[in-house]
UniProtKB/Swiss-Prot annotation:
The gene is rplJ. One of its GO terms (biological process) is translation. Belongs to the universal ribosomal protein uL10 family. Part of the ribosomal stalk of the 50S ribosomal subunit. The N-terminus interacts with L11 and the large rRNA to form the base of the stalk. The C-terminus forms an elongated spine to which L12 dimers bind in a sequential fashion forming a multimeric L10(L12)X complex. Keywords: Ribonucleoprotein, Ribosomal protein, RNA-binding, rRNA-binding. InterPro entries: Ribosomal_uL10 (IPR001790), Ribosomal_uL10-like_sf (IPR043141), Ribosomal_uL10_bac (IPR022973), Ribosomal_uL10_bac_type (IPR047865). This is Large ribosomal subunit protein uL10. It comes from the Bacteria. GO terms for cellular component: ribonucleoprotein complex; ribosome. It comes from Macrococcus caseolyticus (strain JCSC5402). PANTHER family: 39S RIBOSOMAL PROTEIN L10, MITOCHONDRIAL (PTHR11560). The lineage of its organism: Bacteria, Bacillati, Bacillota, Bacilli, Bacillales.
Length: 172
């Protein structure tokens, strides 16, 4: 192999290593059996969520995972794989891929790397069932707002009740 080819492969491996290090959620899937149109649709959905979806050689991914300090991923790197990298959202790629896999049985979730920890396909599917970051924030905010809202309703009711008593006293 020429030194130029080795250099190109090393550059690709460096890119993959950086993606693995910077990613909070990485999902590995087997895409065999999907049509080009289906893969394009999946890429579109992932891109809209800010997730990068790439196909790399398994050897490069193995080297990159070792360089990034990720262990236990080798067993999942067999056959054709595609990898979804998300640097911002843990749940989004898992949710999009799990939903897509329900509609397209040819797509198989193999494993995930969530915040540096290798997880099984079952764990990825469990993460997919969680609400998104925005959903969790809205849940927390509604829980925090409930006591304030109830207090405001109580103050309003007391004010209306006192206003009603004053009107009754004026009429008498």
């Amino acid at each position: 192999m020429s030194t130029k080819a080795i250099e190109i492969k090393q550059q690709k491996a460096d890119v993959i290593t950086e993606q693995l290090k910077n990613s909070v959620s990485t999902i590995i899937v087997d895409y065999r059996g999907l049509t080009v149109a289906q893969v394009t649709e999946l890429r579109k959905q992932l891109r809209e969520a800010g997730v990068e979806f790439k196909v790399y050689k398994n050897t490069l991914v193995r080297r990159s995972a070792a360089a990034a300090g990720i262990e236990g991923i080798d067993e999942f790197l067999t056959g054709p794989n595609a990898i979804a990298f998300s640097t911002e959202e843990v749940v989004a790629p898992a949710k999009i891929i799990a939903d897509f896999a329900k509609e397209n049985e040819a797509l198989e979730i193999k494993a995930g790397i969530i915040e540096g920890t290798v997880t099984s396909a079952e764990d990825v599917k469990a993460i997919a069932s969680l609400p998104s970051k925005e959903g969790l924030i809205s849940m927390v905010l509604s829980v925090l707002q409930a006591p304030i809202r109830n207090f405001a309703y109580a103050v309003k009711a007391v004010g209306e009740q006192q206003g009603g008593e004053e009107t009754a006293a004026e009429e008498a």
